[in-house]
Design a protein with these regions (language model features):
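Bacterial N-terminal signal peptides that target proteins for export
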Residues: 1-13
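Bacterial N-terminal signal peptides
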Residues: 12-22
Length: 358
C-alpha cells in the first residue's frame, strides 16, 4: 500500500458537484488515516546560515527564495520577539549561507512570514501587536505590529498595508495577519488571523485582496470548517492554474479556492496540519507540519509531506527533528530553490535547516 493508499469516503450531496468540476476529492477529517511514512530523498543540514558574531537565531517562521533562484531571505524574531531589539530581522543569505545584507531594525513586533515577488521585492508580515508584558519589559518601546511591509531588495520601504500598532479590519488595519503573497497580475493577498482559536472563539478568518498599488478590492472567508471557511489560514501560494492554495492549518487541510472570490474548489487532508507551503512548476507540493501532536492532531507526525497537487497523494515524507519532546519538531516555513534544495524556518529548534537531495 502506498503512503496515501488508505480508504477514502467522499462528503455527501452539496459538494459532489464541486468535486466533479474541480477534479479534487473532498473528505471529512475522520475519513483520513495518518500519513506518517514514505521515502525520504533528503538529508538535513542543521544550523544553516552564518550570523554575525554574537548574534543567535530566534524562532524563525518566514523564509523564501530570492528571484535569482538560490539566495535565501529569512524573517527572524530577534530572540523571542523583536520588542526592545536593535537587530535587523530581515536577512539575506547566499547559497553557501553567507549573510549578504540585513535591514528592518526597530520596525516590527513579531516577524512571521516573508514573500519575494516577481520583481525581487521583499514582503514581510508582522503578525501581532507588541504585548503589555513586552512594553513593561522594555521601557520606551511602542506598540507595533499587524502590518504587511513591502521592501525593495535593498531595504527601502515601498508600501505598508495596515496601521502599525492597531488591530482592525481591512483596508485600514489587520488583526494578527499570517501571510502575504502576490498574484501574477500584481494583486496582493493577505490572510488573517493567527489568533489562538481556543481562547478567541469569534476570531476573524479571512483573506483580503489589494491591487498592486495597495488599493483594497475585497475580503472573503469566515471562521469555520466548511467549504470556503478557515481556521487559521496560515500560508498561501498560487498553483500553475492560478488557483489560490491555502494552508488552512487548524482545519487540518489544504484548501483550494478561486483567487477572485474565495469560492471553494477542493481540499486535501493527507498533508496534515500545514503551516507552510511551496509549489514547484509541476504542481508538486511541499507542505510542512510544525504542530501535530497528541492534543492538536492525534496520530500525525510533524514533518514535510511531498506530493502532487493534482491528486492530493503524498509520495515522500521528511520526518521532523528529534528533540527532548516525544513529538519532536519541524519548522513553520518552507522554501525550495532552483536546484531543488529545501529550506525550513525553525520556530522550535530555531534558525534554518537546509535539506539536500541524497
Amino acid at each position: 500500500m502506498s503512503v496515501s493508499g488508505f480508504k477514502r469516503i467522499a462528503l455527501l450531496a452539496p459538494l459532489v458537484a464541486v468535486m466533479a468540476l474541480s477534479g479534487v476529492r473532498v473528505f471529512t477529517q475522520e475519513d483520513v488515516q495518518p500519513v506518517n511514512d514514505g521515502p525520504n530523498p533528503y538529508r538535513p543540514i542543521r544550523n544553516w546560515g552564518i550570523l554575525p558574531e554574537g548574534r543567535q537565531w530566534g524562532p524563525v517562521s518566514g523564509i523564501d527564495i530570492d528571484r535569482d533562484g538560490k539566495s535565501v531571505w529569512v524573517f527572524d524574531r530577534c530572540g523571542n520577539s523583536c520588542a526592545g531589539s536593535n537587530l535587523d530581522p530581515v536577512l539575506k543569505f547566499d547559497e553557501s549561507g553567507k549573510l549578504l545584507k540585513s535591514f528592518g531594525a526597530g520596525m516590527f513586533a513579531w516577524p512571521h512570514s516573508v514573500h519575494v515577488d516577481r520583481d525581487g521585492n521583499v514582503w514581510v508580515v508582522d503578525a501581532r501587536l507588541t504585548t503589555p508584558a513586552e512594553l513593561k519589559k522594555f521601557p520606551g518601546e511602542t506598540v507595533k505590529g499587524n502590518t504587511v511591509v513591502k521592501f525593495s531588495p535593498e531595504g527601502k520601504v515601498l508600501m505598508t498595508l495596515g496601521k502599525s500598532g492597531v488591530s482592525g479590519d481591512p483596508p485600514a488595519a489587520f488583526t494578527d495577519p499570517n501571510d502575504v503573497v502576490t498574484a501574477p497580475n500584481g494583486d496582493i493577498y493577505v490572510s488573517e488571523s493567527h489568533t489562538n482559536l481556543e481562547s478567541t472563539p469569534n476570531a476573524v478568518a479571512r483573506i483580503s485582496i489589494f491591487d498592486k498599488n495597495g488599493k483594497f478590492i475585497r475580503s472573503f472567508g469566515k471562521l469555520g470548517s466548511g467549504p470556503g471557511e478557515f481556521r487559521t489560514p496560515h500560508a498561501m501560494v498560487f498553483d500553475s492554474r492560478g488557483r489560490l492554495i491555502v494552508a488552512d492549518r487548524a482545519n487540518h487541510r489544504i484548501q483550494i479556492v478561486d483567487k477572485n472570490d474565495g469560492k471553494f474548489l477542493g481540499e486535501f487532508r493527507d498533508f496534515s496540519r500545514v503551516s507552510g507551503l511551496v509549489i514547484d512548476k509541476d504542481d508538486t507540493i511541499f507542505a510542512i507540519d510544525s504542530e501535530s501532536d497528541a492534543k492538536r492532531h492525534p496520530g500525525w507526525r510533524k514533518g514535510i509531506r511531498i506530493g502532487s497537487l493534482r491528486d492530493g497523494k503524498v509520495k515522500f515524507f521528511i520526518p521532523g527533528h528529534q528533540t527532548d519532546s516525544p513529538d519532536g519538531a519541524a519548522g513553520e516555513g518552507v522554501a525550495r530553490d532552483a536546484a531543488g534544495n529545501l529550506y525550513t524556518a525553525e520556530t522550535t529548534v530555531r534558525g534554518v535547516t537546509k535539506y539536500v537531495k541524497n
